[in-house]
Amino acid sequence: MKGTYREISILLPAYNNVCVPLVEELQRQAALLPGLQYEILVADDGSTCQEAIHQNRLIGQWPCCRYIERKQNTGRSAIRNFLAREARYGRMLFVDSDLHVCSPSFLKDYLEAEGDVVVGGILKGGDASRLASNLRYRYETDYQRKHDFSHRQQAEDKDFSAASFLATKQVMTICPFDENFKGYGYEDVLLGKSFSLHGFRIVHINNPLLMDKYEDNDTYLQKTQEACRTLYVFRTELRGYSKLISWQEKLQKHPWLYGLLRKSFPWASPWMRKWLTGNHPSVTLFNAYKLLYYIHLHEKDEAI
């Protein structure tokens, strides 16, 4: 896929968030590129927030924009596949609708990039002092230091993120999102693996979108547990693409320690949750919580 200014479909899945400013900026940048044929499609995936739906309807009144309301929530994979089918043009830019453009050349930089799949990355931001007690902010900023642009280039398929990436319609037809993923998490990890298995080159560029909104600690812990359950269901497919799986398999080789850890989550989790939802959440403790919960899922399954 060679860089070109000819055409692009910009695809945004939306759920319970207002993305009017994001679409406005994407449209502004697209309109400034000479000769570019473009469309911006926003698909609402059965949102329950009527205020978000009401505000986002404005998008449908803008040139080259469509706002599609879906009555039923179909999940993160299915809504993206729906957008890919609806897209008019051969090159498609997927953008999560809760992010922000932080570069005036964001769209231009994507269009000039070459590769079967191009990933721009995510920059974590926000007021550090105000967010000091936010678990996700702490985790994401710590994660960012270990997965910056240079690190992403070294592990192309294993550092794939669906929050912002460019691909052709042909690539997405061969490698669609797996719609068996109904819950939160890991659908993009498996997609990155699928790209690699089919021989598609994943190119990472330094063209991030900004993430600066973070859910409260309790909500994030609930989402984390949902992601762990998703990982457990698809553990065979995701082997080699998750550190949780790797750690669980390593610990399993030490029966005494593993047996202790398998039974520790029920009594350890209450005080861990209290600490993680408090004013001084620890990333180290959070990682331990995830591992214990993931191991606990094996214990529950084996007890049936």
Predicted regions and their residues:
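Short aromatic/hydrophobic "clamp" motif used to bind/position activated sugar donors
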Residues: 92
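Conserved donor NDP-sugar-binding/catalytic core segment of glycosyltransferases
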Residues: 104-135
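Active-site donor/metal-binding and catalytic loop motifs
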Residues: 201-235
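Acidic donor-binding segment of Leloir-type glycosyltransferases
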Residues: 26-69
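Glycine-rich, basic loop-to-helix element that forms the pyrophosphate-binding segment
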Residues: 70-87
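Short, flexible, basic/aromatic active-site loop/helix in glycosyltransferases
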Residues: 121, 137-157
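Acidic donor-binding loop at a coil-to-helix junction in glycosyltransferase catalytic cores
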Residues: 183-191
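Non-catalytic, C-terminal membrane-associated alpha-helical segments of glycosyltransferases
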Residues: 226, 243-304
